[in-house]
Amino acid sequence: MAETLTLRATLKGHTNWVTAIATPLDPSSNTLLSASRDKSVLVWELERSESNYGYARKALRGHSHFVQDVVISSDGQFCLTGSWDGTLRLWDLNTGTTTRRFVGHTKDVLSVAFSVDNRQIVSGSRDKTIKLWNTLGECKYTIGEPEGHTEWVSCVRFSPMTTNPIIVSGGWDKMVKVWNLTNCKLKNNLVGHHGYVNTVTVSPDGSLCASGGKDGIAMLWDLAEGKRLYSLDAGDVIHCLCFSPNRYWLCAATQSSIKIWDLESKSIVDDLRPEFNITSKKAQVPYCVSLAWSADGSTLYSGYTDGQIRVWAVGHSL
């Protein structure tokens, strides 16, 4: 019996692209977060019933431009956002208020991440720098020239490994870079992409990194060795990548569909294309730009350019 994914529900609340989705680490949590070009972050309460999968419980407002990224703290109490207004914000999810503003980037913030212990924050920006912050909103370090990216920094992620703490970044200079967190020095340049890199993601055990972007190729890297292991052809621009938390799967949100690979066999598990009611010939078919798995790996949340979150459930097909 093969595992496949079925469209379970659609969450409607945003009025513009769903740019990022964050799920809590606690599998029993009923919260989901989504960031959007409508300048808000929605806090969803998931009921998972047939009639009502979930509703937007709260809207976090304060950014003056598109919210490009959102991540949730490991205790589920706070979230962090990055916006095209050039700032980061730390939000208290219980009150829905901003507790910190992080000011320092000179252009749009494209990506944010929390360290495993939530004590450090990293951000990537169109100003071509990577900044490291503490939770008080103080910038502790800026990575720029000569080791940094020479174009926009599109994505930054911490490795879950606490023994050898590293940051992975991707940029529009076609580079994936691995940074040593202890001294913010460059550990490896991962070279191979032929177009800008939109997304990088680190596997749950911290051993692998996957990157993707304009060239439509998902590249898998060994983080300890700094070497490319293999490539998977998605056949279209990759907007987002994420590893399953409990299966050896990699998911790619592309311009045409969501592809899911089994990394053991390097074969496609599923290719997800929802049906859209396109009324006019000129209408752009919505596509997926953000992905997140539930903590238990049973549900995949996907954010689309039509402002909707489509919820996919993993099940068996005979």
From Swiss-Prot:
Highest taxon in the source lineage: Eukaryota
Disulfide bond recorded as keyword: no
Molecular functions (GO terms): ribosome binding; translation regulator activity
Database matches in InterPro entries: G-protein_beta_WD-40_rep, RACK1-like, WD40/YVTN_repeat-like_dom_sf, WD40_repeat_CS, WD40_repeat_dom_sf, WD40_rpt
GO cellular component, one term: ribonucleoprotein complex
Mapped WD repeat ranges: 13-45, 62-92, 104-134, 148-180, 192-222, 233-262, 283-313
Keywords attached to this entry: Repeat, Ribonucleoprotein, Ribosomal protein, WD repeat
Family named by the database record: Belongs to the WD repeat G protein beta family. Ribosomal protein RACK1 subfamily.
Cross-referenced PANTHER family: RECEPTOR FOR ACTIVATED PROTEIN KINASE C RACK1
Protein name in UniProt: Small ribosomal subunit protein RACK1
Organism: Chlamydomonas reinhardtii
Gene name tied to this protein: GBLP
